[in-house]
Structures are given as structure tokens and as C-alpha cells.
Swiss-Prot record:
Cellular component, GO annotation: cytoplasm; microtubule
Residues that coordinate or bind GTP: 11, 71, 140, 144-146, 206, 228
Name this protein carries in UniProt: Tubulin beta chain
Disulfide bonds: none
Protein's job: Tubulin is the major constituent of microtubules, a cylinder consisting of laterally associated linear protofilaments composed of alpha- and beta-tubulin heterodimers. Microtubules grow by the addition of GTP-tubulin dimers to the microtubule end, where a stabilizing cap forms. Below the cap, tubulin dimers are in GDP-bound state, owing to GTPase activity of alpha-tubulin.
Subunit: Dimer of alpha and beta chains. A typical microtubule is a hollow water-filled tube with an outer diameter of 25 nm and an inner diameter of 15 nM. Alpha-beta heterodimers associate head-to-tail to form protofilaments running lengthwise along the microtubule wall with the beta-tubulin subunit facing the microtubule plus end conferring a structural polarity. Microtubules usually have 13 protofilaments but different protofilament numbers can be found in some organisms and specialized cells.
Length: 449
């Protein structure tokens, strides 16, 4: 079985993660004690349940999850929450001090003291796997623990399991809604790490999620619960092909191969259709064309970047439910033909589709969208501008240097982020003809040698 080991860190990561497990338990028919409920279920629920669960004694299913935080609060609320009993008690790893929204505390001081106990749990879980496919990490980049300790863990896992996939669900700071003043610092230092150590980053941000809740779901006062509901639907969609039988499968590695034309450009926008609010999973029966249309809609993207401002390098569409693959293919071709200016022409057929037969609970069919668009640079550019504004005056730096960080590290992170923006811009502007001329020149030089 191709197992995925799930890690959640910090307050944001733990809240998203616990929501995700509620969704996955629901899909696989696992109740709050970890037992499988057979009524109304089907064999397919158990067929590949090993991807996310370990089977323990007495027929209980235990999530392959590691939960970490530098303060006990969020963990305790998960533990006392509805699904708190299904996790392995040893897999809760937490400190008492908190990171105080300080990346340096998470990455170098407090987090570094706790990281070995987290890695022990990760190793134990990895040893329980038959054929570990990779890791998925939920965290935010604005705080201290998820960003600082999250990226520390990612780099440690990278060292120990270099050939396994590393997928992150990273919540970026929002443009208008700021939780803490030092978000731009924490986010830039984190991106510096993610560019090097992660294989695939799904970029999320609260503001875009709020917009979806307001505009599409018509919720007047969305809670984090509603936002996390959207994220968990997407997370479940990304891995459904591994967990349920399908006609066209995809896994984390296939996704990466199809989506990442250049190694550093692995930050994706995600979307989901049909969008339903948490309480009213209306029994909407959409058609494949409607799903496709909604999923490519800019309003559907879960990060604050507008795909119409850039071009898609690659994209992936994952459909769930009983549908004709021919229709799926036709729709995908249709999207590419109608919006050809939004796709780079030097990667032909750059949309991959996959179909999984089992839809999510209460839906006839659904689709998950993952796009590698150059417009994601808007997010990085925005954070980078805020970073530069503060860093120029060395504002708040003493909190970081006090934990032993060097200003040099800030400068490096800043230029790495700016390089990333420049790379996206370069490929956004690239056109097919120029590439050809370049290749011919290359060949001529080669002949001369």
C-alpha cells in the first residue's frame, strides 16, 4: 500500500488537520472510536484504508498522524473534541513554552528542543508503513510553530527520507487580514525553506477562503471551522485516487511529475467544486461541464492570487464520482481551447486529469483543481514588499537575533523570495519562438566544439 504520513504543526495546522481527519473518517466509515461502521458502507471504504490508517488490535483504525505544537492548548482541544480518541496518544508531541509568533523560536530554540521527540514518532510511524509514499504537512507560515518548527521538521524529514514525496498545505498570510505584525518575516523565512525542501506546496490563505464563504456560500459570518471545511475537502480530493479505486489514477509523485516543469516552481493554487457550506451539503447534482467551469473559476481559488493575471504552466483536474472519462477529456480540452491565452504554449497538453469512482459523502460528483500558475507570484511579491518595508528599518529584528539568528539569514531569505518571483515572471513572459531560437544557438555552439 502507498501510505501517507500526516503531520500537523502549530495552531492553524492542528485545526486544519483535525478537520481533515473528520472528513477522511467520514469517507472511510470510521466512527469516533476508530471502529468501522459497516451499515450503508461498501468494501471500497476498507480496500485501501491503509493509506491513512494503521489497523490496531480489536479492529480499530488509528490515523497515521503526528500532532505537534509548542503549547498544549490546541492539542487539548483536539483531544477533547469529537475525534480526539482515535489518535495514538503517543503521537501528541507538545511543549509548554509556545513560540510566540516567532519563527526563530520555532526553528532554532524552542522547536529545536522538541524536534527529536517529534522525529521519533515520525520514525515509528514510518516503520509501520509497507511502502511509504510520502508526507503531508499542515501548517501556517505566519506564526511561529507551524512556520519555524514546521520547516525545521520538513528539512529533517528530507534528510532522513530523501526519496519520499513531501507535500505541504501551507496557509499564507492574507493581504488584508493580518494576525500578527511579524507575519512577513515568518512567511519569508519559511518560503526560503519550502523552496528547497518541499516537493509540492498547496498554497492557501484565509482571505481567499473568507471570500469563498461570503460570495459563493453566502455565509455572513464565516468561522475558521467553515474555512477549514473547504481546505479539508481539497485535501481529501488530492489523495482520493490513492484511497479509492478509479479509472485514471494519480498519486503524489505522478502529480509532481505532471505539475512541476522547473524544480523551484512547486507552489500550487487549489480549488474545489461544487462548493457547499458545512451544514447544508445540498444534494447538488452537477454535470461534468458545470464542475469543470466552477473549478476553473478564479473565484474558486483558495489563495489570494488571480490566475487571470498570469498563465498556467501546468494544471491537474481530479474528478470523483461515476462519470464518463470521455466527457472529462472533452471538457479539459474545451477549457484549454477556450482559454488558450491563459496557458503557456510551450508546454502542450499541460492539463492532467484523473477520475476516481467514489465521490465524497453526500455528493454525486466533485472535482479538485490544482494549478501551477505564474500568477502565484502575486502572493510572494506582496509578502516580500511588506518584509522589505520592515527589514529596511530593522523593525522587530531583535526578537529574532535574540534567539541567535543572523541578519544574513534574513537577507538570503529575501533574495530567495525575490528570485522566485523573477522566475515565475520569466516563464510567464516566455514564448515558444524565443525558446526555439535559443535551442538552435545551443546546437550550433555544440557543433563547433
Amino acid at each position: 500500500m502507498r501510505e501517507i504520513l500526516h503531520v500537523q504543526g502549530g495552531q492553524c495546522g492542528n485545526q486544519i488537520g483535525s478537520k481533515f481527519w473528520e472528513v477522511i473518517c467520514d469517507e472511510h466509515g470510521i466512527d469516533q472510536t476508530g471502529k468501522y461502521i459497516s451499515e450503508g458502507g461498501s468494501d471500497t471504504q476498507l480496500e485501501r484504508i491503509n493509506v491513512y490508517y494503521n489497523e490496531a488490535s480489536g479492529g480499530r483504525y488509528v490515523p497515521r498522524a503526528v500532532l505537534m505544537d509548542l503549547e498544549p492548548g490546541t492539542m487539548e482541544s483536539i483531544r477533547s473534541g469529537p475525534f480526539g480518541k482515535i489518535f495514538r496518544p503517543d503521537n501528541f508531541v507538545f511543549g509548554q513554552s509556545g513560540a510566540g509568533n516567532n519563527w526563530a523560536k520555532g526553528h532554532y530554540t524552542e522547536g529545536a528542543e522538541l524536534i527529536d521527540s517529534v522525529l521519533d514518532v515520525v520514525r515509528k510511524e514510518a516503520e509501520n508503513c509497507d511502502c511509504l509514499q510520502g508526507f503531508q504537512v499542515c501548517h501556517s507560515l505566519g506564526g511561529g510553530t507551524g512556520s519555524g518548527m514546521g520547516t525545521l521538521l520538513i528539512s529533517k524529514i528530507r534528510e532522513e527520507y530523501p526519496d519520499r514525496m513531501m507535500l505541504t498545505f501551507s496557509v499564507f498570510p492574507s493581504p488584508k487580514v493580518s494576525d500578527t505584525v511579524v507575519e512577513p518575516y515568518n512567511a519569508t523565512l519559511s518560503v526560503h525553506q519550502l523552496v528547497e525542501n518541499a516537493d509540492e506546496c498547496m498554497v492557501l490563505d484565509n482571505e481567499a477562503l473568507y471570500d469563498i464563504c461570503f460570495r459563493t456560500l453566502k455565509l455572513s459570518t464565516p468561522s475558521f471551522g467553515d474555512l477549514n471545511h473547504l481546505i479539508s475537502a481539497t485535501m481529501s480530493g488530492v489523495t482520493c485516487c490513492l484511497r479509492f479505486p478509479g479509472q485514471l489514477n494519480s498519486d503524489l509523485r505522478k502529480l509532481a511529475v505532471n505539475l512541476i516543469p522547473f524544480p523551484r516552481l512547486h507552489f500550487f493554487m487549489v480549488g474545489f467544486a461544487p462548493l457547499t457550506s458545512r451544514g447544508s451539503q445540498q444534494y447538488v447534482s452537477l454535470t461534468v461541464p458545470e464542475l469543470t467551469q466552477q473549478m476553473w473559476d478564479a473565484k474558486n481559488m483558495m489563495c489570494a492570487a488571480d490566475p487571470r493575471h498570469g498563465r498556467y504552466l501546468t494544471a491537474s483536474a481530479m474528478f470523483r464520482g461515476k462519470m464518463s472519462t470521455k466527457e472529462v477529456d472533452e471538457q479539459i480540452i474545451n477549457v484549454q481551447n477556450k482559454n488558450s491565452s491563459y496557458f503557456v504554449e510551450w508546454i502542450p497538453n499541460n492539463v492532467k486529469s484523473s477520475v476516481c469512482d467514489i465521490p465524497p459523502k453526500n455528493l454525486k460528483m466533485s472535482s479538485t483543481f490544482i494549478g501551477n500558475s505564474t500568477s502565484i507570484q502575486e502572493m510572494f511579491r506582496r509578502v516580500s514588499e511588506q518584509f522589505t518595508a520592515m527589514f529596511r528599518r530593522k523593525a522587530f529584528l531583535h526578537w529574532y537575533t535574540g534567539e541567535g539568528m543572523d541578519e544574513m539569514e534574513f537577507t538570503e531569505a529575501e533574495s530567495n523570495m525575490n528570485d522566485l518571483v523573477a522566475e515565475y515572471q520569466q516563464y510567464q513572459d516566455a514564448i515558444a519562438e524565443e525558446e526555439d531560437e535559443y535551442e538552435e544557438e545551443g546546437e550550433e555552439q555544440y557543433d563547433e566544439q
